[in-house]
Amino acid sequence: SNDVENAVWHYLCVSKIDGVKAAEKQFIKITSDRRVPLKEIHALFAEGTERQVLDAIKAGDPGPAALARNQFYGHLYLGLYFEAQGNAIKAADYIAKAAKGHEAHGYMGQVARVHHEWLQQKVKNKEVKPEK
């Protein structure tokens, strides 16, 4: 497959069952997904950086629609990445950003919305402490 999202969801599933180290060992290499910022998201899960994803979101001076799409996918996958890494506060922050404009992003927008609601419930139940 040449779809970064397939590789990322595989990573997320493996990390939930067998841990992050196992997910890293089994991470699927993708070389030709050209969607912004998916290349950088793939790199993030393969030991890249948050900054690479954030920079890619704005690279090339995208128009408003492209910027909104880039921000949505960047924030969604940054949130899921940080959740897998055990950083619940950063995860919740990025997922909340992705969920804000969920209506414009179809199925994946609904994923962001539902995940945000789930994380809010965890905060309410004091399973995750909100950022101060």
Indicate residue ranges for each PLM-predicted region.
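Residues that mark the junctions of alpha-helical repeat units in TPR/alpha-solenoid scaffolds
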Residues: 3-5, 64, 71, 109
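Alpha-helical repeat scaffolds
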Residues: 20-34, 52-64, 92-96, 126-132
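Alpha-helical tetratricopeptide repeat
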Residues: 69-80
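Alpha-helical junction/boundary sensor with strong preference for TPR arrays
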Residues: 1, 31-34, 45, 60, ...
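TPR repeat positional signature
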Residues: 7-9, 14, 37, 75, ...
